[in-house]
Amino acid sequence: MQWLMRFRTLWGIHKSFHNIHPAPSQLRCRSLSEFGAPRWNDYEVPEEFNFASYVLDYWAQKEKEGKRGPNPAFWWVNGQGDEVKWSFREMGDLTRRVANVFTQTCGLQQGDHLALMLPRVPEWWLVAVGCMRTGIIFIPATILLKAKDILYRLQLSKAKGIVTIDALASEVDSIASQCPSLKTKLLVSDHSREGWLDFRSLVKSASPEHTCVKSKTLDPMVIFFTSGTTGFPKMAKHSHGLALQPSFPGSRKLRSLKTSDVSWCLSDSGWIVATIWTLVEPWTAGCTVFIHHLPQFDTKVIIQTLLKYPINHFWGVSSIYRMILQQDFTSIRFPALEHCYTGGEVVLPKDQEEWKRRTGLLLYENYGQSETGLICATYWGMKIKPGFMGKATPPYDVQVIDDKGSILPPNTEGNIGIRIKPVRPVSLFMCYEGDPEKTAKVECGDFYNTGDRGKMDEEGYICFLGRSDDIINASGYRIGPAEVESALVEHPAVAESAVVGSPDPIRGEVVKAFIVLTPQFLSHDKDQLTKELQQHVKSVTAPYKYPRKVEFVSELPKTITGKIERKELRKKETGQM
């Protein structure tokens, strides 16, 4: 407990006494190139692997031996001047305490499910690693969810526990009685709440002594809910192999991270990107994970952060770069920034060119899914081809295939596939939990069919051409139309609806709803009704899903069997009709 009293951060977060940070060169220690996390060849899979013990504890030992520089493992700030800095040894202490809270206080066991619904606060990382230490399967989710979304996820996953914040506790309480599996509710807050355990107090008083479970590499580690087109989100279950991927030399080459690097990734905490780019990848390299907690997106704050702190690796969806470019500057030089990455959306060639012209930096594109993690990428030193996402990353063999799983010739449009036979890649999702039919449906011959369309050139560069499903990609948020349509139809004005993506110069796509009104609402003011429907969707599901565009129609295009033809509506939006 002496250390916790000395290290005043998370519980009673201290105000930083340094308004001006030292120059980047003073903050970033020299690279300890002779050391690195345990690694294997690109296709060798160890029988046992647990990220907490094999990687985090490895770096903690290096710190103890004086063989890692002074950079923190974790560096968190917010707009109020609060700051948290943890070393790997301190992370080890805290996450072992968290592990004991889960197993001893909450009675959770290896294989149990725990819903993790936190914003970008330090506790998110403690919970994720604490779950790894105990073998508990954590289920990240965005904090933008509403009671209906939470109910669906808790019921489908049979989660025995949940960790969340004040703002969501009431939503959870409103549906908890319908979740028979839910036994433990942990609250991250400065205030108590009836029926909830105080996460921070429990961690303070927990023992720092804990033995990490022995995990098989193929034991389950995490579940991500991924948007569906004809139904609600599916559960993509991953093994510990997802956390092993950054240890492969071919993957390490992607960013060539060093212990001296400071990496900032702007990802929603519910995305797979957060688990990979703000946890397993940077910490595999022993570098600093930097987080600026932004309750509201603010382009100017992002620019100020990149100017103020020694961040040299930065990741954001392409719309973030477009928003930065819209700011009033002809050129800008970030003092420490060296590597910029993007994913989640297609990068326009003109944005790549403009970013380089105004910042002097290249923009490296990467591509992945909730089911796969990183599939392909461009990386430092690699030729950038505008319009192409890069080449396959180990351990994946990526090909463009037809509907039967046959590999297509170069520059031929087809389905982007990942080879799963004779050996399934260790970082590919295990299955859609509880849905063997959907799991089997995405297998196509010897390949996993991503559901995305693309083509590959003679050099192995992959071009993304679009989705073969109806998923809407708005600023990196993947939105299933069924979720929005289900929310809309709850309103008495909506007889039926169809939701598609509509092109947008900033967000890539926005949600557009085509709505057939019920007779009693036909004479209502359409502008007022649009606002009412938008607010309704925000109130019953995650606000980012609301339709920014609404068009009232007399009927929807349908097939002879009565199925709505969203592709016809998409053509209308893209001017193809």
UniProtKB/Swiss-Prot annotation:
UniProt modified residues of type N6-acetyllysine: 146, 204, 214, 356, 391, 531, 538, 549
Keyword Glycoprotein among UniProt keywords: no
CDD domains with a match to the protein in the record: MACS_euk
Enzyme class: ligase
Location(s), subcellular: Mitochondrion matrix; Mitochondrion
Matches recorded under PANTHER family: ACYL-COENZYME A SYNTHETASE (PTHR43605), ACYL-COENZYME A SYNTHETASE ACSM1, MITOCHONDRIAL (PTHR43605:SF5)
Functional note: Catalyzes the activation of fatty acids by CoA to produce an acyl-CoA, the first step in fatty acid metabolism. Capable of activating medium-chain fatty acids (e.g. butyric (C4) to decanoic (C10) acids), and certain carboxylate-containing xenobiotics, e.g. benzoate. Also catalyzes the activation of lipoate to lipoyl-nucleoside monophosphate. Activates lipoate with GTP at a 1000-fold higher rate than with ATP and activates both (R)- and (S)-lipoate to the respective lipoyl-GMP, with a preference for (R)-lipoate.
Assembly and oligomerization: Monomer.
Protein's name in the database: Acyl-coenzyme A synthetase ACSM1, mitochondrial
Species this protein is from: Homo sapiens
